[in-house]
């Protein structure tokens, strides 16, 4: 739900974007907007020096990134893997170790402001990972984020996102209590 709008912003800023989605309708829409649809994640990995992952759940990130057909195994040495999904701290650290073994940069970069923020191009990014690799990404990230923070080592982004979510849900509960 968020990956499509994020890819759309990249396309509008004239980036060449390769993508893979299990939903044929989303793939058709991506192609209609100028994206190149790949048959699988391995094909995306072989085409791009920067790969952005935006899937819904922790296990989906692992499915896309790990294993023989995953991004980590198929990306070229020196490439950057950017994970924008919200996931477990332990999982992002495990993926970082796998990426480092393959000579990749892994940037932990969960985003806030939901689908509306992705559509508007005003996401908040709570990034972490190699500082130089992160800074090289800024022109890409600015296409769909208005607020971009680097918070330290891989995992710090996920911790900050969980803190953000806790504060959000505290506010929701407080409003429900207040207004009944």
Regions found by a protein language model. Give the residues of each.
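Residue-level "edge-of-site" marker
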Residues: 23, 43, 58, 112, ...
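Rossmann-fold dinucleotide-binding core
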Residues: 86-169
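Glycine/proline-rich active-site loop of Rossmann-fold NAD(P)-dependent oxidoreductases
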Residues: 173-174
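Short amphipathic alpha-helical segments
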Residues: 7-8, 31, 63-66, 93-96, ...
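Rossmann-fold NAD(P) dinucleotide-binding segment
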Residues: 41-106
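NAD(P)+-binding Rossmann beta1-loop-alpha1 motif at the extreme N-terminus of oxidoreductases
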Residues: 1-53, 79
């Amino acid at each position: 739900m968020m990956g499509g709008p994020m890819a759309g912003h990249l396309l509008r800023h004239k980036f060449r974007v390769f993508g893979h989605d299990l939903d044929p309708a989303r793939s058709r829409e991506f192609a209609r907007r100028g994206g190149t649809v790949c048959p699988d994640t391995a094909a995306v990995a072989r085409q791009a020096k920067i790969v952005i992952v935006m899937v819904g759940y922790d296990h989906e990130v692992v499915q896309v990134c790990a294993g023989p057909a995953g991004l980590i195994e198929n990306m070229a040495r020196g490439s950057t893997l950017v994970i924008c999904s919200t996931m477990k701290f332990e999982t992002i650290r495990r993926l970082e170790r796998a990426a480092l073994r393959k000579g990749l940069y892994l940037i932990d970069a969960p985003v806030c402001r939901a689908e509306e923020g992705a559509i508007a191009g005003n996401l908040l990014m709570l990034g972490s990972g190699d500082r130089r690799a992160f800074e090289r990404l800024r022109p890409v990230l600015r296409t769909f984020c208005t607020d971009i923070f680097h918070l330290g080592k891989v995992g710090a982004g996920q911790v900050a996102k969980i803190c953000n979510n806790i504060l959000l849900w505290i506010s929701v509960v407080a409003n429900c209590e207040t207004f009944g």
